[in-house]
């Protein structure tokens, strides 16, 4: 269910604004999107796992808050670019 450290490092390298940038909203959105996609695949097999579904909803809400921050702080262009890179719809 969790992502490997290698996958997390590759996401950090792709979405980091500057070197050693692990905490920016862009990186956190990318990591949350990866975790959400892993949980979505889990639910295709385990349809009745309601406890993990609550965790999924929490992750989606957390990602939504980061995306709203990016839109407010960096503008609509950065927001749209990130959504396209992540492959999520709005």
Curated annotation (Swiss-Prot):
GO biological process: translation
SMART domains given in the database record: Ribosomal_S15
Gene Ontology cellular component list: cytosolic small ribosomal subunit
UniProt keyword annotations, A-Z: Ribonucleoprotein, Ribosomal protein, RNA-binding, rRNA-binding
Residues annotated as transmembrane: none
Keyword rRNA-binding on entry: yes
GO terms, molecular function: rRNA binding; structural constituent of ribosome
InterPro entries to which the protein is assigned, alphabetical: Ribosomal_uS15, Ribosomal_uS15_bac-type, uS15_NS1_RNA-bd_sf
Family: Belongs to the universal ribosomal protein uS15 family.
Subunit composition and interactions: Part of the 30S ribosomal subunit. Forms a bridge to the 50S subunit in the 70S ribosome, contacting the 23S rRNA.
Function of the protein: One of the primary rRNA binding proteins, it binds directly to 16S rRNA where it helps nucleate assembly of the platform of the 30S subunit by binding and bridging several RNA helices of the 16S rRNA.
Name of the protein in its database record: Small ribosomal subunit protein uS15
Originating organism: Wolbachia sp. subsp. Drosophila simulans (strain wRi)
């Amino acid at each position: 269910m969790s992502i490997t450290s290698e996958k997390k490092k590759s996401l950090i390298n792709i979405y980091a604004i500057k070197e050693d940038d692990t905490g920016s909203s862009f990186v956190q959105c990318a990591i949350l999107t990866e975790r959400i996609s892993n949980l979505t695949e889990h639910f295709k097999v385990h349809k009745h796992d309601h406890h993990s579904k609550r965790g999924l909803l929490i992750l989606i809400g957390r990602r939504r808050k980061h995306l709203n921050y990016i839109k407010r702080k960096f503008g609509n262009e950065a927001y749209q670019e990130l959504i396209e890179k992540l492959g999520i719809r709005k």
